[in-house]
Amino acid sequence: DRLRSRGLGDVYKRQVLLPCIGLMEHMVELLFPDDGSAAEEQEMDRLEERFLQHPALSIEQSRLVTNSMAERAEGNLLMAVGLRNRWSDKDFRMVGETESVIDRYEDKLGTYLMKITSKSLSQSQSEEVSKYLHTISDFERISDHALNISEAAKEIHDKDLQFSPEACHELDVIESAVREILSVAVGAFVENDPQRAARVEPLEEIIDGLCDEMKSHHVDRLQSGSCTLNQGFVFNDLLTNYERVADHCSNIAVAIIELESDSFDTHEYLNSVRAMKSSSFARYYEEYKQEYHL
């Protein structure tokens, strides 16, 4: 009887309790959320109205909050990219929740920075505020693309889509390049490092080239029948989002570099960089070309 009771208990655990574990975990998360929301509130509390009477202080608080926003956007993108190879319901939900948090960062920062611009600012202070106003939308858009990428990964998971080995290799390469450009751009922003920011544009061009090459290979696979239309739609969605993330990283780098030259003429800057092909640009381009190729 004891053995029979134990056997029935094992069956109960397998058939009744195990399927409920995921639901129970989700309920615990809802009842006892992590300290992410508390950390967000703590960050937002830096943007106090009374600091607006002291521009140096309000700008410094804005810098700290924008840096936090940048790092959250980077973390969200990395989490989303990781879902393609390692699916997790929890991480998928976290990407969506973090995207909402970053939306609130943009709203609060944008409003606060505009209030700062109405104060009497020195030229350097005005330029710093302009830098933040130029970049918070890029960080928000990067997080938007993280959400898009997570939804593409969910489609891959839900439909059990299997890419060809060639397509998987290509995605691994471009995802590695996107991780790198994001790390460089966010690091350059947080450290206010124009020299590091100068590495972004060469890598952005490499990523553009990879996307073009991958799209061409994708058409070949469709024609040969080694790739289906369903796989193709998701593949193209991923490429589009990776390419746009790189574009936003380029915008961030431009804001950092142009702050040093007292100008925000993005078009002029990019044209001059690409036309001159400075020694550092060419060196970084060749370095990344060797590292990221199909």
Feature annotation, model-predicted:
Residues 1-3, 7-8:
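Positively charged, low-complexity/disordered segments
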Residues 9-10, 14-294:
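Cytosolic, long alpha-helical scaffolding segments
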